[in-house]
Amino acid sequence: MTTNIHQHRILILDFGSQYTQLIARRIREIGVYCELWAWDVTEEQIREFNPSGIILSGGPESTTAQGSPRAPEYVFNAGVPVLGVCYGMQTMSVQFGGKVEDSTEREFGYAQVEIKAESALFRGIQDSLNEQGKPSLDVWMSHGDKVTAIPEDFITIASTDTCPFAIIANEEKRFYGVQFHPEVTHTHQGQRILERFVLDVCQCEALWTPASIIEDTVVRLREQVGEDHVILGLSGGVDSSVTALLLHRAIGNRLTCVFVDNGLLRLNEATQVMEMFAGKFGLNIVHVPAEDRFLTALAGINDPEEKRKTIGRVFVEVFDEEASKQAQVKWLAQGTIYPDVIESAASATGKAHVIKSHHNVGGLPEEMKLGLVEPLKELFKDEVRKIGLELGLPYDMLNRHPFPGPGLGVRVLGEVKKEYCDLLRQADAIFIEELHKADLYNKVSQAFTVFLPVRSVGVMGDGRKYDWVVSLRAVETIDFMTAHWAHLPYDFLGRVSNRIINEVNGISRVVYDVSGKPPATIEWE
């Protein structure tokens, strides 16, 4: 009998904060399942979810504006604890008769809150004693409006010099509001506060662990597919790799993996994928060499968006052809993860603006008529990595820098040719190798090389050469929504440049990209 890892669950209502997914990840780290829903859910949906507690997120709106979002009334009638964060605290205050006003003194960044009263949520949690000898917390604020009068039956737990109601509580109903963001690392005791809310106030058990997730997923996969066969497109990336191992554990050789070698992979990647999954793990893999087909389809195409669509279209064609050979297959597996589900839901509202086609999302023909299996759809990326480790995948593989779905197709600028891909593969391998040797690889968030379709004059020995240019790119980021270019040491960059120019015949110049995001994107295309 497996543990019901969804037995205790937290519902997070999203009011639009940039940090909302971070709240969910923090709750999962505590070991408790949670889901993230839009703020305008119905009473029926909340009842069906049956949460042990509810968190109201922050958001960019103002409760003083007409028509601003409000928490559904049932949230406060469900008989479970509620934690309002920033905007969530403000809307809770207004809905219970308190007042919120636009503040002339906005708080963005570090603040110190002084704890003035006992609370079940904060008992024993503090960073230091302030000058008056009162316990205080170092927190991260990000708000313009502030509560100026708290509702009846609420008390003030803590305040700052400019925010008289930084923490409020109705202890009897177990309703709490914090004006700061406990989910960000800048709030030093933030994780302890969330743990106290989830484990003590909501009385959840920490059942959400990698081992229990694997056990639960295997049981559910067996229930879903029965004795049927499943097909999966295996890329060697984290998501498809973990999906493959979960399915293999659940149904064994009734899983067929199709590995499409499109000629746009990193150096020796196809060999590594086959050795790892067919060799070490014993998976049933169909290896499809399709470099010529992809490069032929890409010939003459310079537009980045058109390249992406072409790569996606050809992949679907190749995969469809292989799938049609597997007559016994009834299910298609995909490595969809929870942020993909959230993003798709947001796109369905019409509020999302497409900057680029998503690197890792594609469609398959409806005529395939296969059922869909998505073992990772409840998981964040960091959870997928932890499960991969538990399943025996190497740490280095699970923690490689992101690689786009179209591969080198979006790292060769302009038209994609075999010559360009071969040069880029060699140059990129040198860059990554040197990052590892200098212990810099894990200190940057993403690093790669871009092929520029321009020639530059160089000197080699006594002769001139007129060869291609590549750019090195390395960034530091927390969420990949914004990024700073990495300040790699000059001597390191010089060493990489020398190796590439001397070892890769056809490249005469190496440059380093010092663009941040925004205004640039991380990938060049």
UniProtKB/Swiss-Prot annotation:
CDD domains: GATase1_GMP_Synthase (cd01742), GMP_synthase_C (cd01997). SUPFAM superfamilies: Adenine nucleotide alpha hydrolases-like, Class I glutamine amidotransferase-like, GMP synthetase C-terminal dimerisation domain. GO terms for molecular function: ATP binding; GMP synthase activity. Pfam families: GATase, GMP_synt_C, NAD_synthase. The active site is at 86 (nucleophile), 181, 183. It catalyses: XMP + L-glutamine + ATP + H2O = GMP + L-glutamate + AMP + diphosphate + 2 H(+). InterPro entries: Class_I_gatase-like (IPR029062), GATASE (IPR017926), GMP_synth_C (IPR001674), GMP_synth_GATase (IPR004739), GMP_synthase (IPR022955), GMPS_ATP_PPase_dom (IPR025777), NAD/GMP_synthase (IPR022310), Rossmann-like_a/b/a_fold (IPR014729). Its EC number is 6.3.5.2. ATP binds at residues 235-241. Catalyzes the synthesis of GMP from XMP. This is GMP synthase [glutamine-hydrolyzing]. The gene is guaA.
